[in-house]
Amino acid sequence: MNLFDNYLTSKTSPLDLFQLLELIGIGSTCKVYKAISKKTNKIYSIKICNEIEKNYEPIINEINCFRLFKNENSYIVKFYGIYYLKNDNTIWIILEYFEYGNIISYLNKINYKPDEELLATIIQNVLFGLLYLHSKNIIHRDIKSQNLLLSSEGRIKISDFGISINKNNINPNNIVGSPYWMSPEVIIRDNYNEKTDIYSLGITIYELVEGFPPYSEFKPAIAMKKIIQNPIKSLKNENKYSKELNDFVKLCLNVDFNERPNVSQLLEHKFIKKSGSVKLLKNFIEENNCYFFNQKNSFSENNKNCENEYMELNSYCNNNIENNNNNEEEEINDSVIVHDDDNTVIVKENNSKKQILNYKEILKYDSNYSNLEFVEHESTSNLSYNTDFLNPH
């Protein structure tokens, strides 16, 4: 019996139902394809996961979230099914397809920094999604621009629920998330709540307006230390932005999570009142379609080279990981990335090679990878370095 039998949409082979068209994302344990339904000709994204025994937990976690959501909310990525391919021992997760990818890749591709009306509209969409998640007692725990996907109808949708959790099941001893966007209370293992997502949203705004998250010049573990020692409380260049935007970000980044506003309160903020009509994002997409698709076509010519470069980098990162079950290690030093379920994932220093591990160093790959949606979510029990910094979905 397959571990996933109770979760499958049907036991039909996915090869009988879908034709894979194009590779759009790569991870160490999964690949994402643009695919077409053989029956309806509808386009989907299909996440094909291998090493499924090792990755059981995050896969099931995401599936359970999607089952809870039932595609009820327009600001959450839609889920259409899960299938098992026996020949390859792979799980196929059928998801909504996003031609334009995540919001940061899209903006980078068209070389556009959002004005405050567009930014307010983007963030309002994210808040609508978070309002729904939090109403279901779900904490996302990985809010960042790479997990905010831009749909053709002009909505921002939240994706990637591999480490999401019911707020009643939180174990504060687990440090989970993407380091640059991680809230102080998660890092210090406080009894955090859904307002950790609000902090990550504040960092996401910082990323969208500044081009990168705070402390991105440092390796992830060092950045986590700095988040605690010298918390980010505002945008880097406040004088460039309105009072409303600066105030909104400061509220999100309040170090005391009990003092942070909740989603409903943020939706009433003056900055969000700057958001445009429901057609604003759709019109923005249409105005930039020509430039976007020219950039996309240019990228496609180098797709194979990009895949090889990514796999080399990912292989290097994975080869420098060591599992450590010593729960007494409390200090976040230069090596520790994340703790989860009694496992400690450690990035080992390698003096013979330069480790490309900080956000800014990784950005040099972004011109090649701008169209790839890196969607894997590494469970710390997989002994794999979390490559979220490579522009994942």
Map each language-model feature to its residues:
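Activation segment signature within eukaryotic-like protein kinase domains
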Residues: 122-123
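Conserved short submotifs of the Hanks-type protein kinase catalytic core
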Residues: 88-102
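Conserved N-lobe beta3->alphaC-helix segment of eukaryotic protein kinase catalytic domains
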Residues: 43, 48-72
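Protein kinase glycine-rich loop
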Residues: 21-27, 32
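Conserved catalytic-loop aspartate of Hanks-type protein kinases
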Residues: 197
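Short beta-strand micro-motifs within the conserved protein kinase catalytic domain, predominantly
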Residues: 78-88
